[in-house]
Each structure stands twice: as structure tokens, then as C-alpha cells.
Amino acid sequence: MTDLSDSSKLVYKAKHKIRFVTAASLFDGHDASINIMRRILQASGAEVIHLGHNRSVDEVVSAVLQEDAQGVAVSSYQGGHIEYFKYLIDLLRSPKNEAAGARVQVFGGGGGVVVASEVKELQDYGVARIYSPEDGQRMGLQGMINDMLARCDFDPAVKEPKTLAQTITALELGILDPKTIKPKSAPVLGVTGTGGAGKSSLTDELVRRFRLDQGDALKIAILSVDPTRRKTGGALLGDRIRMNAIHGDGVFMRSLATREGGSGLSGAIGGAVAAW
């Protein structure tokens, strides 16, 4: 039975806004555990970009960099965890991505599939933490989430934003004045509707047709906004899970939380549109 001590029930209070990407690894349909973890992350105040199951390293890294997340959590029960997590670290730390990816904390779990010697091997390689069944018994679910949040509780902003993702982060944090950004002339289309109306599916279909019709000649940006929970400050940013046509150099996607109760848009949306 899981030992939930008093300390493990206390929710970590972060000093900064923390963003996490969560997913189950490639060829892996076991998403029950990662769904539990992303729900607790959200309930603990994190903004969670959930990708769902069967996600490649390329897809995960692309999401982490475009979303400018501090952490990524992946569950892997399909037996290929050594190769998967090492490749994930390699891509994040590659010269191409080093400016944004070097700081990203990588977390994983796979129950009894990942044995103790492999846990050590992966953590020695650069994974921040692989949580074992013994960790779950000792720390409890909230205890593991608290550990993840504490390791990712650092200022996500950089002094001189070099990427679009970093620019949007600076806009969200209010340290960059949107008036200093010269608006581009790209046409802007807004899609709105109630939850479950099909906004993400429609957007994905539009992107797919633009790419097919124009032969990937266009550069396309998608800015997706979801509400922040007033009580916890967390948010589930789940539109990426419906996007199948965004994978490629010409498409950028960023998920934003409203961060303000009662608002339907993020305060950074105007600056983000101008920055593109």
C-alpha cells in the first residue's frame, strides 16, 4: 500500500510559473499513470501541455521547445526506455537546441519495467529522475509531484530572448512590452467556441490543407488558449493532443493559459501575434 505521510500530502508552493509537457512514449498505449501525474501536476499549480500516448522523441522535444517548458514527464512501459530517454536527452542538449533545451528537467517512470541499474544509468546520463515503484511507496504521488515541481521551480525567462518561444514567455511574464514588437503583416484567423466544439480538430484540418495546397511554402503559427483554474493556478493545455499536421519546420504552436480569472484570452496574445 502506498505510504502517504503528512509531508507527502502538502502541495509544493512554487515561486515561479511552471510549465510541463507530459506524454507516454512511442509504441506505448499505457497512459493511465501519466494521466494521473498530469492531473496532480495541474492541481498543484502547473501548466500542463499534455500530448497523450504513442509520442516520439521528436514530437516531445518539439513541444518542449515551442512551449518553453521547464520540465517534461514521460511514462514508458514498452521496454525501450533506455534508448528513448537517452535520445530525448541527446536532442535537448544538442548544439541546435542547447540554448533552450539545456535547462529542461526530464522525468520518467515505468513501474517495474525499469530496473534499478537502468534507473542509475539514465540518471547518470542526464535524466533528472526516474521514479520507481519504491519511490511511489516512500514518497506518495503528491511527494513525487512535489519533487518534480521543486526541481523545475526556476525563472523561465532569459535576459535576451533568442527564439519566438522565449519571446512569448517574456510577454506572459510581463517583462517584455508588446509595444516594442513591430507587428508583422501575416493574416490572422481566430477560432472560438465552447469546450468540445471541435476547435482543435478544425484548426488541424486547416493547417493540413494549407500545407498540402501550398507545398509547405507557408510558415504557420498556432496560438492556443485555455483557462487557468482560479483555485490552483494550474491549467490543462491539451490542444496539441488533437494536432496531427503540425509536425514540420514550417509550423509553430504555443499553448497559453489565461492566467487571469474571468478572461477568455491570455494577456500575452496580442504581443505573441505581433511577434510572429
Report the location of each language-model feature:
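Extreme N-terminal, non-catalytic leader segments
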Residues: 3-7, 141-188
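ATP-binding Walker
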Residues: 28, 194-197
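Non-catalytic signal-transmission and effector/linker regions of two-component phosphorelay proteins
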Residues: 1-18
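Gly-rich Lys/Arg/Thr-decorated short loops/hinges at beta-loop-alpha junctions or inter-strand turns
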Residues: 14-21, 35-46, 67-71, 101, ...
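Conserved phosphate-handling catalytic cores of large alpha/beta enzymes
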Residues: 116, 123-165, 259-261, 265-266, ...
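Cofactor-cradling patches in redox/metallo enzymes
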Residues: 27, 34-143
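Residues at the beta-strand->loop junction immediately N-terminal to the Walker
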Residues: 23, 192-195
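Nucleotide-state-sensitive switch-loop elements of NTP-binding domains
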Residues: 172-186, 197, 202, 206-276
